[in-house]
């Protein structure tokens, strides 16, 4: 199964319409929907924010898209077809369009929304999907800089994403990462590691 390596943004203009493509690798439907909502909030005045996600979660495929007010099947569907052609999963995309005053027609919309998805996927780089797990890390405040250095230094290697940080008597952090990180985490001193 293939996905994309990184979150990224692409942008281009077509007949004065501005297209911005946002893409992010995701592991769950909830993560995809949160990403889509965050992009819509960034562009509340956009003419259209066309959402799309394709997620394999617990052995079930969730593939959802819509046209966000564009004529039927001229926005979400051509973007979805790009994911089918490239065989990419566990990804969320939002194509934001600002209308520039010149109508593109159905064919122009189809081409440009497909182009947005294709450019975004290519820029985010297709890679083999690696299953991620959730880890809870618990440690004393005095190890905060050491833990942050470890997580930052290994972010790419293990695909680390910090989901939550809580500071009370101790620091508790919830992360998503490739399973290979577990051995490294367990070798660290003075840290409690729980794999969810």
Each model region followed by its residue ranges:
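C-terminal regulatory domains involved in ligand/effector binding and gene-expression control
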Residues: 1-73, 155, 162-164, 187-188, ...
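Short amphipathic beta-strand starts and helix->beta connectors
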Residues: 4-8, 117-123, 149-161
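Ordered, amphipathic secondary-structure segments that act as subunit-interaction surfaces
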Residues: 63, 70-106
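Conserved structured catalytic cores and adjacent interaction surfaces
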Residues: 108-110
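Long, charge-dense
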Residues: 114-132
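Short glycine-/aliphatic-rich beta-strand segments at the starts of folded cytosolic domains
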Residues: 127-141, 171-175
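Short amphipathic alpha-helix segments
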Residues: 139-158, 182-184
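Non-DNA-binding regulatory cores of transcription-related proteins
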Residues: 160-178
């Amino acid at each position: 199964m293939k996905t994309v390596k990184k979150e990224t943004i692409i942008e281009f203009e077509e007949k004065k319409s501005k297209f911005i493509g946002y893409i992010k690798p995701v592991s769950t439907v909830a993560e995809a929907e949160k990403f889509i909502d965050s992009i819509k909030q960034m562009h509340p005045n956009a003419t259209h924010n066309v959402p799309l996600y394709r997620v394999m979660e617990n052995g079930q495929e969730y593939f959802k898209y819509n046209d966000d007010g564009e004529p039927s099947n001229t926005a979400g569907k051509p973007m979805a077809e790009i994911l089918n052609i490239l065989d990419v999963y566990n990804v969320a995309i939002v194509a934001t369009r600002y209308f520039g005053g010149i109508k593109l027609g159905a064919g122009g919309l189809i081409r440009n929304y497909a182009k947005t998805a294709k450019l975004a996927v290519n820029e985010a780089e297709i890679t083999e999907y690696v299953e991620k797990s959730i880890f809870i890390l618990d440690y004393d405040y005095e190890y905060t800089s050491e833990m942050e250095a470890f997580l930052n230094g290994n972010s790419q290697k293990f695909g680390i994403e910090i989901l939550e940080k809580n500071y009370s008597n101790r620091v508790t952090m919830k992360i998503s990462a490739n399973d290979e990180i577990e051995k490294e985490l367990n070798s660290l001193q003075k840290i409690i590691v729980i794999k969810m």
